[in-house]
Amino acid sequence: MALDLSGKVAIVTGSAKGIGASIAKRLAADGASVVINYASSAAVAEELANSINAQGTGKAVAVRADVSTIAGGKHLLEEGVKAFGKLDILVFNAGLMKNDVLANVSEKDFDDHFSINVKVPLFVTQAAVPYLKPGGRVMFFSTSLTKNTAPPPNYLLYISAKGAVEHLVRVLAKDLGAKGITVNAICPGPVDTDLFRNGKTEQQIQFFANLHPQKRLASPDEIAPIVAFLARDEAGWINGQKVYVNGGFNV
């Protein structure tokens, strides 16, 4: 049975493809109007929006915005509210993941990771608060790697940034919880996306797949349902949580 998100408006960053696209499709299938965000994949984003609109459940618009900058994130927020008149659900799916040895880590790498993963989501949340009413939802994306007692090498910046996200969620959950707005972190394990595959050999990809009991990577469509669940009214008592969706990756 579809979850009832009729009348809700959602903005999903980085949603032209991968996990973000699956989230957009699922929220729309459950009745929400969705703002699809892209930076360069205009044709892909428009095709996704058209396919959602053709299904006749939810609605969708595609908005170009560079969410690695605060200005770009605020532009996305403004265009989303302009398109649908309000905001109920804000999902920070866009992210950066680069693995490298410490000797090769640059100041730009550091700034890039913390900008798109931490700084922009924080300040877009700040800008979104006036639009979010009681029952509003803010969802950040972290990673199951922060739970590992033995994190993989060369993921220094990514894991550090996501660790910051998790603490940001804890504090925001209290600050915004007083307004009836929940804030949670979705923590997937390895998911078969371009972001995950980028810079890895097939041997490395298979290594991560073998850490799962089912010996495979997750698909984006296996992550989207938890976002749809947390978006529904019945999930209003779930707040400040790290929700692991990883197939037993680190049990």
Which residue ranges define each predicted feature?
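Catalytic loop of short-chain dehydrogenase/reductase
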Residues: 139-164, 169-178, 190
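Alpha-helical segment proximal to the catalytic Tyr-Lys
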Residues: 130, 174-175, 236
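Short, small/polar-rich loop/turn modules that mediate ligand/substrate recognition or access, typified
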Residues: 177, 182, 238-240
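Short C-terminal tail/terminal secondary-structure segment
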Residues: 228, 239-251
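Conserved glycine-rich cofactor-binding loop
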Residues: 9, 16-17
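Substrate-binding pocket helix/loop in short-chain dehydrogenase/reductase
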Residues: 101-102, 106-114, 154, 204-208
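A conserved structural motif in NAD(P)-dependent oxidoreductases
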Residues: 212-223, 234
